[in-house]
Regions:
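Bacterial N-terminal signal peptides that target proteins for export
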Residues: 1-10
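Bacterial N-terminal signal peptides
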Residues: 10-18
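N-terminal small/polar-rich segments of proteins
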Residues: 21-91, 121-161
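A surface/secretory-pathway sequence property marking extracellular, secreted
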Residues: 85-105
Length: 161
């Protein structure tokens, strides 16, 4: 009698472990958005880098049962065309800056080429809306004597899953 009670549990466990991932879950969609970094007033005489943070947000919709999803999030070069030498622009004037994946600001956030990094994840997503936030760490090196004005750059955030 005890074996009959245990047998269904064993069969169900084996069936759940043997089921292919695609049949147990449906990933409906994922989207990515980002907040702007605002470095505030830059003082070229301060002797220290200006730093700021922003957020990249990934939102995935899942129906049925949960699943694991592999993804990467990359950033473009911006107007400079170069990951390790990004430039903020103000008309003909430019100012060096960069974006990083870590608080120490040692890992340039790019597309995974030319010594840059991407952020990646393989989270278990549950039914419904799932949100994952990544911090973007920005830095403008010290001692850049530039004309006053508003310096900007625009980058593209790409999520691959």
């Amino acid at each position: 009698m005890k074996q009959r009670r245990r047998l269904p549990v064993v069969i169900l466990t084996c069936a759940a472990l043997a089921a292919p991932e695609e049949s147990s879950a449906v990933l409906q969609s994922c989207s990515v958005s980002a907040t702007a970094l605002n470095f505030g007033l830059y003082d070229p005489l301060s002797g220290s880098a200006a730093q700021s943070t922003g957020t990249v947000t990934v939102v995935c919709q899942v129906s049925l049962v949960g699943l694991f999803v592999n993804w990467t999030v990359a950033l473009s070069t911006g107007s400079s065309g170069n990951y390790v030498a990004r430039q903020l622009q103000n008309g003909p004037n430019s100012m060096s800056y960069n974006l990083y994946t870590n608080a120490a600001r040692t890992s340039v956030w790019g597309d995974g080429t030319s010594g840059t990094s991407v952020v990646s994840a393989n989270p278990f997503l549950i039914v419904g809306s799932n949100t994952v936030n990544y911090t973007v760490y920005g830095s403008i090196p010290a001692a850049q004597d530039r004309p006053a004005g508003s310096y900007t750059d625009t980058l593209t955030v790409t999520m691959t899953y």
